[in-house]
Amino acid sequence: MPEDELEDLPGVGPATSDKLVDAGFESYQAIAVASPAEMSNTADVGESTASDIINAARDAADVGGFETGAAVLQRREEIGKLSWKIPEVDELLGGGIETQSITEVYGEFGAGKSQVTHQMAVNVQLPPEHGGLGGAAIFVDSEDTFRPERIDDMLRGLDDEIITDLLERREIEGTPGDDETMKALLDSFLDHIHVAKAFNSNHQILLAEKAKELARDNQDSGFPVRLLCVDSLTAHFRAEYVGRGSLAERQQKLNKHLHDLMRIGDLYNTAVLVTNQVASNPDSYFGDPTQPIGGNILGHTSTFRMYLRKSKNDKRIVRLVDAPNLADGEAVMRVKDAGLKPE
């Protein structure tokens, strides 16, 4: 939205309009979903003024009111589904990972959480007819897990039919079996994966703001951002806030971070995929003692919760633990050199 239209809001003159744009509030919708405290801190306006601006933007953008269930259903038709390319898992998820939602994948070390994020960074770039969303990925890396070589493995692991179609769409000459051709295709895929390493929790929160800017800048491009991965969501928070005395502060920061991620998903029709670490509950005498980190804050904010569990050799059990519209259940996949594959 052009800057001069922001000046139609009460209390917004040329100077305030510039401040709002510099802080990332470039549209009525972006303003409407902000909080007065957030706008006051980032755009350097008074909290009372921020409240008036936000309320006016909500009226102008028709955000924040009631709507019928039929209208919600119609709006949900715009939501995309990112396929795992594993029929059993896709069926479990009702088609794949949803845009405008947070999907949490948790599990112990070596369960395959980072494998999922890498595979989705490949799959999201596939056209819809092949289960993708035809978009780019953002990868916030807090554990130094991103490996371009793994993207190469997974790209080469696609069916030749899909690779041939990708070569044609991206105007790359050659065949799926040619190394130079596949290297050119890999370079093309890596160009649409935006990676940033998070050095601590504050930096990770800042990267969420940068991800929002990146999604905004690319929303009208040939590859809009359709996937935001955070691997892992909780590693820095867990390391920096130790003991019960710091628990409240940790949860407050984590809550804000999650809502920042959720806002990106809502504003730019992006799927948000986060991985989470686990801990063992010593008080559990029956069943699996493995519990995800993050407490109720993360449990309530994640739209879909998935538990990855090791099985024999390369087999992994994928369990859907929580979803608003789907029954709990399990599926099986294998972690191969060529990527995530069906049983």
Curated annotation (Swiss-Prot):
Keywords attached to this Swiss-Prot or TrEMBL record, sorted alphabetically, are: ATP-binding, DNA damage, DNA recombination, DNA-binding, Nucleotide-binding
**Which first-to-last residue range defines the signal peptide?**
none
Q: Name one GO molecular function term.
A: ATP hydrolysis activity
Q: Which Pfam families match?
A: HHH_5, Rad51
In which domain of life is the source organism classified?
A: Archaea
Q: Which Gene3D superfamilies match?
A: 5' to 3' exonuclease, C-terminal subdomain, P-loop containing nucleotide triphosphate hydrolases
Where is ATP annotated to bind? Answer: G107, E108, F109, G110, A111, G112, K113, S114
Biological process, per Gene Ontology: DNA recombination; DNA repair
Family in the record: Belongs to the eukaryotic RecA-like protein family.
PANTHER family reported for this sequence: MEIOTIC RECOMBINATION PROTEIN DMC1_LIM15 HOMOLOG, RECA/RAD51/RADA DNA STRAND-PAIRING FAMILY MEMBER
Function recorded in the entry:
Involved in DNA repair and in homologous recombination. Binds and assemble on single-stranded DNA to form a nucleoprotein filament. Hydrolyzes ATP in a ssDNA-dependent manner and promotes DNA strand exchange between homologous DNA molecules.
Q: Which HAMAP family match?
A: RadA_arch (MF_00348)
Q: What is this protein called?
A: DNA repair and recombination protein RadA
Species of origin reads: Haloquadratum walsbyi (strain DSM 16790 / HBSQ001)
